[in-house]
Amino acid sequence: MKTSLTGMKIKLKLVLLMFIGCLVSQGLFAQEQQTPNDYVVVLKRFVQRLHDPDLATDIILSQDLITSKKLDEDLQDYLLASIDEIRINVQSKDINQLEYLSFAQAGRKETSDIDLEGIDPQQVYFVKYLKRFVFAAVIRDKKIASFTLVSKGNNKAHFVFY
C-alpha cells in the first residue's frame, strides 16, 4: 500500500510538472507572436516619426526599418530618398485622420495592385487618408521591413527588402 501511495505521488507530481510546462511554453509562444494591434502600433509610431519635421530621415532609417548589415552607399541613398518621398506625402496630411488597415481589411479592389510575392498578408498594412491609400508596409519584428507607395495604373507595386 505504501508503494502504491508513493507511485501516485510521483504520477501526481509528473502531471503537475507537465501542466506547468504547458503553461510556460504557451506563454513563451504567445510572447513571440505579434497581434494585429501590435502591427498597427508599429505603423502608427512610424507615421508619427515621419510626420515629425525635427527628426532626421537617417534616424528613422536606423531605428524604424529593418535593413541588411551590408547596405551600400547607393542603396542607402535610394532608401533615404524613398523615405523622404513617403515623408512628404505623410507630412501634408492631418495624421489624426489617417486610417491603418490590415491587408484583409483593405479589400480585394485596393490590394489587387500589390504583388505579395510570398509575403505573409498578415504582415501587410496600409495607411489610408480620406478614402485614398498613402502607402503600404510590411511589418516584422516590431519594425518596418519594407514599404511601397500604392501603385496607380497598370503596374503592380512590389515590396523591396533592403
PLM regions: where:
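Bacterial Sec-dependent N-terminal signal peptides
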Residues: 1-37
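N-terminal export/targeting and maturation segments
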Residues: 30-79
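Short solvent-exposed beta->alpha transition segments
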Residues: 59-116
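Exposed beta-sheet edge and beta->alpha loop/turn motif
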Residues: 105-162
